[in-house]
Amino acid sequence: MFFRMLKEDIDTVFDQDPAARSYFEVILTYSGLHAIWAHRIAHALYKRKFYFLARLISQVSRFFTGIEIHPGATIGRRFFIDHGMGVVIGETCEIGNNVTVFQGVTLGGTGKEKGKRHPTIKDDALIATGAKVLGSITVGEGSKIGAGSVVLHDVPDFSTVVGIPGRVVVQNGKKVRRDLNHQDLPDPVADRFKSLEQQILELKAELEDRKERINQK
């Protein structure tokens, strides 16, 4: 099973990177592949509570690849890191199958809280260059995070997110409209004038009522 997964990781490189030309080249020169293999070993040790040895392997891998994956992170099959330099994946991160990330991506936490504090990335997601996905949030199945985006909230399935902070611009193949009907927005100044006008009318009515009572006396 383990060796079949390693072979699958190599095949994933050929599927994702048109620049890959031979098994020899991929095995010896792809730092993303090296980082994934090192993580698979470190994670197996981590699950067996060999924490120090797992962290040691993780740190050696980081030194040689420029990719930091905590051994506690759970990563599925056919995970692909393209270019890789600067990728950081936190301890409680959960990554599904067929996920792709590019250089400079951070799947990190937002504080010092304990427990689940890193993102969950579902199957077939893609996270582009320099994107930051932070906190215990979920990036939905088949979703895409644009380059340089900062995502702090859950992303629905089959969505595209861009910007800082990240916002959904496409969902289920359809553009998400942003409400720019400024004429329909509330006008606080006009609302205040209407309130004052109503108070004046009420005061006039009260004065008229008192005048009538005085005249009757």
Curated annotation (Swiss-Prot):
Key word Cytoplasm present: yes
Annotated S-S bridges: none
Keywords associated with the record: Acyltransferase, Amino-acid biosynthesis, Cysteine biosynthesis, Cytoplasm, Repeat, Transferase
Pathway annotation from the record: Amino-acid biosynthesis; L-cysteine biosynthesis; L-cysteine from L-serine: step 1/2
Taxonomy, superkingdom: Bacteria
GO biological process: cysteine biosynthetic process; cysteine biosynthetic process from serine; methionine catabolic process
Catalytic activity as recorded in UniProt: L-serine + acetyl-CoA = O-acetyl-L-serine + CoA
One of the Pfam families matching this protein, by short name: Hexapep
Gene Ontology molecular function: serine O-acetyltransferase activity
Enzyme Commission (EC) number: 2.3.1.30
GO CC aspect terms: cytosol
Regulation: Inhibited by cysteine.
NCBIfam families: cysE, EPS_EpsC
Family per record: Belongs to the transferase hexapeptide repeat family.
Function: Catalyzes the acetylation of serine by acetyl-CoA to produce O-acetylserine (OAS).
Protein's UniProt name: Serine acetyltransferase
Organism annotation: Bacillus subtilis (strain 168)
